[in-house]
């Protein structure tokens, strides 16, 4: 699926006009079957009063800006002190030709300070939220963000699960996966066949009881607390015609 790209006002210089585009990498919109997260930049149509997206890729990128965002605790971490040095680094695989290299030879584009938010999430605050490329990137069609700290790459609990339904009991069976679900967590479920679909439930046990009849025995379950949304802002050069 696609990452959201929102066009903003471009500069008016004729020699080398600058375009600014906002890009939201939403973990629930990642490419199917891709792990770690991988996104294809595709245009969206008009949604209500909001125009989302005007082009299918970024071209002549000269600067990238990131804003604060939240992440769930990685599978390797259980406490805020587990983040070595209180830092997390973000690297984009497709932009590996231009990146910062640390003393251990690992590359990154952004460094973040880790701030605790809850027992399930932390906020990442950019130490320097701008990365300027030495040479313009001709085209960016895919983005694959990779997170790590000084101990190595970080893996996250799944935010989307394909689940199965017991047609006799109308219970959703949770697979044994890294979903990190606990009692009282809020989830969203798709796949109902019901005029007034109920999309949110709290899991009281390892099963989630379904009230309306189901469209099929295969449905999707979304876990908001595990969702990651990376807000990025790109500056590009557009050659005048």
UniProtKB/Swiss-Prot annotation:
Nucleotide-binding keyword on record: no
Taxonomy, superkingdom: Viruses
UniProt keyword annotations, A-Z: Late protein, Virion
Disulfide bonds: none
Record localization: Virion
Role: Forms the penton at the fivefold vertices of the icosahedral capsid. Together with the minor capsid proteins (p17, p49, and M1249L), forms a complicated network immediately below the outer capsid shell, stabilizing the whole capsid.
Name assigned to this protein: Penton protein H240R
Organism the protein comes from: African swine fever virus (isolate Tick/Malawi/Lil 20-1/1983) (ASFV)
């Amino acid at each position: 699926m696609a990452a959201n790209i929102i066009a903003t006002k471009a500069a008016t210089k004729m020699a080398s006009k600058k375009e600014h585009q906002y890009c939201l990498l939403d973990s629930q919109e990642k490419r199917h079957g891709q792990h770690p997260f991988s996104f294809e930049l595709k245009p969206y149509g008009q949604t209500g009063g909001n125009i989302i997206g005007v082009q299918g890729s970024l071209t002549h990128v000269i600067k990238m800006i990131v804003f604060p965002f939240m992440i769930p605790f990685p599978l390797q971490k259980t406490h805020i002190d587990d983040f070595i040095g209180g830092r997390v680094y973000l690297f984009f695989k497709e932009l590996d030709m231009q990146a910062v290299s640390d003393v251990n030879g690992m590359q990154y584009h952004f460094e973040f300070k880790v701030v605790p938010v809850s027992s399930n999430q932390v906020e990442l605050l950019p130490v320097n939220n701008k990365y300027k490329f030495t040479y313009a990137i001709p085209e960016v069609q895919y983005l694959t963000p990779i997170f790590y700290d000084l101990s190595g790459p970080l893996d996250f609990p799944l935010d989307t699960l394909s689940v199965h339904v017991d047609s006799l009991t109308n219970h959703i069976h949770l697979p044994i996966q890294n979903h990190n679900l606990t009692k009282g967590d809020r989830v969203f479920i798709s796949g109902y066949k019901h005029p007034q679909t109920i999309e949110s439930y709290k899991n009281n046990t390892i099963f989630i009881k379904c009230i309306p009849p189901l469209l099929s025995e295969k449905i999707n379950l979304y876990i908001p607390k595990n969702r990651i949304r990376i807000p990025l802002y790109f500056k590009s050069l557009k050659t005048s015609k």
